[in-house]
Amino acid sequence: MKIRFDVLLFISMSAAMLLTLGSCKTPKLSEANAQFGRGEYFNASKTYKAVYNKLSPKKDRELRGEVAYQLGTCYRRLNMAPNASAAYQNAIRYEYPDSMAFYYLGRSLQAEGKYQPAIEAYNTFLEWKPDDQLAKEGINGCRMAIKAKEGKKSRYIVKNAKLFNSRRSDFAPMYLDKELNTIYYTSSTEKATGTNKSEITGTKKSDIFFSKKDENGKWGKPEPAEGALNTEHDEGIVSFSPDGQTMYLTVARRAPEADTSVEIYTSRRSDASWSEPQKFEITADTLSAYGHPAASPDGTYLYFSSDMPGGYGGKDIWRINLKERSGSLENLGPQINTAGDEMFPYLRADTLLYFASDGHPGFGGLDLFKAHLNSTGERWSVENMGLPINSSGDDFGITYGLGESGFFSSNRGDARGYDHIYSFEYPEVKVTISGMVLDKDEEPVPNAIIRIVGDDGSNQKEVARDDGSFRFKLERGVKYVMMAGATGYLNVKQEFESDMEEEDADYEVDFILAAIHKPQVVENIFYDFDKATLRPESKEALDEMAQMLRDNPNVTIEMGAHTDMKGSEEYNINLSNRRAKSVVDYLVAAGIRADRLSWKGYGETVPKKVTKRINREYPQFAEDTVLDEPFIETLSEEDQEAADQINRRTEFQVTSINYDMY
């Protein structure tokens, strides 16, 4: 349970209600009313329950409904959502007249994660008060939760930080400084100072505890904060100056049978010990509550939560300039604050605020929100942190350590309403691109160099491994240009864009480099039968060839076409010559300068020599075998057709690498 400093505010809101119940002279009910009026919700819940059980369901229906409503409110204040839901349902069953019973039933059901029944309760309440913004936001939150549960699972990893947790409430963790080796938090463990239980929560009053990492980076056993911090009162919810020498803490003091004062105090550190806290004066207003301090990373501001006048309802987040206090008090405005409660601020950066709220649409109870301040310092953009950071219960008091990891507090899954500390981690989204650099025979290219340039300004270079493989680490949502090359080979360029998905991804791209010193077959160039007309399916291969020439602007080539051995030699020379020229004509039309291109038809005069790649595809042909006429005549009819197909090819040969250089 959290230090709830809304006691004073709540007492005034429920004064009329207590007048009605006060008309009953039953001593036990009068005792319950008095406990409730002082904010002693734990004690009052027990007394109200005893009164409720003795009232007749038939004769005392009206009073039973009123007591059930009060009992529901006690349970709600104790964060015991299932008990609160049952009590409010009893109040409605006994026709309790205040429509707020439906509103609070909706809140309690939402805190249980029963979203559809919660929507129904909110809608019933809106029949009485159709303009109520909190009820509307409650419905929005329920719908958001239903949609989120059906959607993609978040990458966040959330675990119970068992070392820090006791059998009572443990919450609001905070690192001491940038070293991240010491963490402080608030606890109502049985080891807390003092002997008396809190009449408000039924547990011991909270103290400040801490844990330190050992030389192996493991957290040590938690101990009470050293020095004069912990007393018989409630202390906790701390923040620290950037140098870790000043602690800001919340102190709730209560005299017997009296109201509770909630204020911010400061303490100074000397070695490992803390001085006796001194009150931090914010205003002269002594009726309002001030708590949940959060120092900004640059030490300029102290953010805090308060129900002081001038807010937007409930408790708001404010800030005060620590260097110029006079006249610097500032409400963070309606983008942050709502008609509900905004509490537990935490500044990760001077323009990045985290806080808990039950006024913005959420999953139930308090939700954690992230807010960015724009470049002009005039507007906050607020975002719910979503599942699994948020739950149907109370989620609050976050702090960040290294990267996207840290701790926060939640009472999720605890029917008693006790808070516990959880760790969280958002694993880095790993985006990579990998592939191979091979030659036309699909063999690794030695010492190939791959460069990758992103429109985010990144520029990486890597030498392919001996097997031709490479791998780069990338960022999400970036356009990249990659170029692969090696001595004795033409460069190849490829472009792509990584997407924005928050998922690991490994893009794959291979580079096939053409060697300069020998002819290179151009795959997938097709002609009409017995003609030089290029078929439409050749376009992709021809366009890739044009791009290769653009990527290698100092290269000139000869296009060569080859035929099988059917037909006369003269006929085949003529056909292949026309086919080679057709390719050159296409490249010129694609923007390649004509003086970089020549062509020649070889007919059947240069039969293909079997390469490793051809051997893998046609194992019947041994590597280095020349597919000439004498060899082909020894083959079966089927293998002869395969050999003819291999011989029918279009190739290019680099003729110069110095074009237009001088």
Q: What are these regions, as identified by a protein language model?
A:
Residues 38, 42, 81, 101-104, ...:
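Short, conserved micro-motifs composed of acidic
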Residues 455-469:
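Short, acidic Ser/Thr/Gly-rich low-complexity loop/linker segments typical of extracellular
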Residues 515-555, 563-570, 635-656:
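Short, solvent-exposed beta-strand/turn patches at coil↔beta or beta↔helix junctions
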Residues 478-489:
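A short, solvent-exposed beta-strand micro-motif common in secreted/extracellular proteins
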Residues 357, 361-364, 562-662:
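Periplasmic OmpA-like peptidoglycan-binding domain that tethers envelope proteins to the cell wall
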